[in-house]
Amino acid sequence: MAEANLDPVFQIQRVYLKDVSLEQPNSPEILLNQEQPGVDIQLGVDAKPVADGMFEVTVTATVHTKIADKTVFLVEAKQAGIFEIRNMQTDQLGAILGIACPQIVYPYLRSNVADVIQRGGFPPVHMAEINFQAMYEQQQAEAATPQIIV
């Protein structure tokens, strides 16, 4: 009788660009403006099971640049990965999905966002490195804080 293999498994199955959009609602007029635009970057991480032992982890970025109240450009991108994760304890699984997987996916997202912005005729926006462990720990702390409803 063969014994079941209970060794932990963590494998990248695929990394892919799930969605990307670039909007320039005020072009070409805004392109003539010489002011330095403000840049707002928002990030998000989502993880969900897609099959037995298979998970999709998606890192989302929204890059919004404005001059005064007018949008120069808006980029929304979702980079995802499919990971095989088996034989992990529940607390380990959360950390892998919230830290390790986003760290693998994020460099692809950074590159794709910079490329889309540059192809749109703008200097690339270089997104900073992200400490996904700190981000995950902050989310866990916020989730553990009791909500007071008045």
From Swiss-Prot:
Keyword field contains Protein biosynthesis: no
GO molecular function: unfolded protein binding
Superkingdom of origin: Bacteria
Regions crossing the membrane: none
Record-level GO cellular component terms: cytoplasm
GO biological process: protein folding; protein tetramerization; protein transport
Swiss-Prot/TrEMBL keywords: Chaperone, Cytoplasm, Protein transport, Translocation, Transport
Compartments, record wording: Cytoplasm
UniProt cross-references to Gene3D superfamilies, sorted A to Z: SecB-like
One Pfam match: SecB
Main subcellular localisation: cytoplasm
Entries under InterPro entries matching the protein: SecB, SecB-like_sf
Main function: One of the proteins required for the normal export of preproteins out of the cell cytoplasm. It is a molecular chaperone that binds to a subset of precursor proteins, maintaining them in a translocation-competent state. It also specifically binds to its receptor SecA.
Subunit structure: Homotetramer, a dimer of dimers. One homotetramer interacts with 1 SecA dimer.
NCBIfam families: PRK05751.1-5, secB
Family: Belongs to the SecB family.
Protein name: Protein-export protein SecB
Gene: secB
